[in-house]
């Protein structure tokens, strides 16, 4: 009986082994060194008998996935680029097809969280040996995100970058958009209204206002209907990551079926600098201006034209409807060569 079970297990592993890989590369992301790593990855995979193709076309990827004659059981996609590229690939794949991030963006927040490598040999090892695992995603007005969605001053900076971007972004590229936003942005009040449906678990829906010394689980108690949040800085996290290594919401968990909302009430430069200093020191969660909630669905609105961004990409103006998509994305556990 034991031998039979072992044979069945080996058959299942063989049946799930990756035999075809498409590398989806963003034409705007990455440097020359990164492009060389893509070429090396193609050589490595083909040398190991894995069919491999590089594409810049999401349409071509969609056609391949829709080809029932080819099947997708032993198919995987490498997303070579930044967080926006990974989210774009994920949005156009069914949940069961595994994705391997190959970080080539500016921040690479998802790749840093899961420790994915940009080195071709490591990516090849992940494709050969990585176990499948799932994570949640979010949806903002129909656009999928994996890390976070924000509205307010930081989204205005991202919008400024969107208007002037010419190729690969580096950190110093944000200097001009930051100065532009500081001179123009008026910090309108943003309102977040939670959509509490019947499927919200009373043990996990609740107000986490002000942080404090009470444990997170103890704070999430039997509060089914929360009032709106009014604030100048509005953020919702799927991962506990933000640009420049800022730990704004350290408790966000990517597999709990919830988004972690963090709002900071006051606008204008001095309040923003105060919040930034507290975030750097890890003190901001104790500030009375800070409101935290864990939600499944919400809508953000504003009386003025307030931008919002998802995973570092400008996405439009408020209003925005946001929801969590539990277990929406499959990744392969990173391995090293």
Could you say what each language-model-derived stretch is?
Residues 79-83:
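N-terminal glycine-rich "phosphate-gripper" loop used for MgATP/nucleotide binding
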